[in-house]
Amino acid sequence: MHFSNLLFIGIMTLGTSEFCSAGPLHAQCKVEWYFSLPCRSVYEALVTQIKKWRTVSTCATGGEKCLYKLQSASVHFISAKHTTPVKKYVDDINFRLVSYGFFTHCHVSAMSVSETWYAVTDHGTNYCNLYNLMEGSGLTEAPGYKEITSDFLCTQRSSANCTVY
């Protein structure tokens, strides 16, 4: 094989791997949350909220607090999808729940990633996918609530308007 062919294949492989996985050039969000609650309580609140917002009717007054679909759930891991009501874009959502403090506290690592391979910006949609579930479930008012994220970890986080997205 000629060097130019190998070079072309190498460049295409690197370029393809960047677009097929979430990375800095892909619309996504990673958030860490901490609660002074057992993970079972956090798990139940999130799963209940995902199920509550499964139909389009909960978006009748605007926003995107609808069309969530629970994929799988255990007290340690929740997987869901969110479909935007207008453009029908799909985002993959995961919550990993880890107990600490003799099972009295919960650390949640959450991620939302756009399935649309060419999505680079998202107006904070992936952040709102996660935050809206936290707020809707009442967990933002829970004891010990703490959120850690940034624009580096969440596409357009600082400009997100979660009443719209």
Q: What kind of region is each of these model predictions?
A:
Residues 2-5, 9-165:
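Ser/Thr-rich, low-complexity intrinsically disordered terminal regions
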